[in-house]
Regions:
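Short glycine/serine/threonine/alanine-rich loop segments
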Residues: 88, 135, 198
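Gly/Ser/Thr-rich loops at beta-strand to alpha-helix junctions
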Residues: 75, 96-101, 122-124, 178-182, ...
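PLP-dependent aminotransferase-like
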Residues: 114-174
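N-terminal "arm"/small-domain region of PLP-dependent enzymes with the aminotransferase-like
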Residues: 1-73
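Active-site phosphate-binding strand-loop segment of PLP-dependent enzymes
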Residues: 148-209
Length: 209
């Protein structure tokens, strides 16, 4: 990250959110707000199921723990550490799983009538985002491995053809990898998209498996 964007001295041995939660737990605050299990006191069945260590730090957003809507302390530091670890300019912690992240990504880029190039086997969150923003999908049909019976990634030739036929598309979206672990040539696709003045979006929800 650039120096003007980084507020904290980055130390990858730190775990800012965990550390803040642990400090808050040790304060033994008596809760009068949400969640209703009151750090386990109000729901012994839930505590027995999840464990005291878990419910003891399941607390409401408050100043010592920062606020995800406008992070300025521990969440902001965690985001900067994540960006540094990933080699990215910025990182944003999300709630709602990768579905909300993918939808946010598409809605940030596309508006009504915009074309976006994407594989036919995208996650439904992408399709939901297109419905919400009114963008027009330009589908690339991935080939199928007949022996394994699974769909593959987008080929460079397929993406190149789609870009030439739809030069006004605003972005190319790639599953990296697919739900079966198949990766497209992401580096080549990114270059093709950028050379055409398009953004390249990557759904990497299954990339950690």
């Amino acid at each position: 990250m650039s120096e003007n964007r980084t507020r904290f001295r980055l130390d990858q041995r730190r775990a800012p959110i965990y550390e803040a939660l642990e400090q808050f737990r040790q304060m033994r605050v008596v809760p009068f707000d949400v969640p209703g299990h009151k750090r386990g006191r109000g729901n012994p069945e839930l505590t027995a199921f999840l464990g005291q260590q878990c419910v003891g730090v399941d607390v409401n957003s408050m100043k010592p723990l920062d606020n995800l809507c406008h992070p300025v302390s521990v969440i902001r530091e965690a985001e900067e550490l994540a960006a540094d670890a990933f080699g990215a300019a910025h990182a944003f912690l999300m709630v709602g799983g990768t579905t909300s992240s993918v939808q946010s990504m598409v809605l940030t880029v596309c508006k009504r009538g915009d074309e976006i190039i994407l594989p036919r086997n995208v996650h439904r969150s992408v399709l939901n985002a297109l419905v919400l923003c009114g963008a027009v999908p330009v589908y690339v049909n991935p080939e199928v491995d007949k022996r394994l019976g699974i769909s593959l990634g987008m080929k460079r030739e397929q993406v190149e053809k789609a870009i030439k036929e739809h030069p006004n598309a605003v972005a190319v979206l790639v599953n990296n990898p697919t739900y079966y672990g198949i990766c497209s040539d992401l580096r080549a696709i990114v270059k093709m998209a950028h050379d055409a003045g398009m953004l390249c979006l990557a759904d990497e929800a299954h990339g950690t498996h």
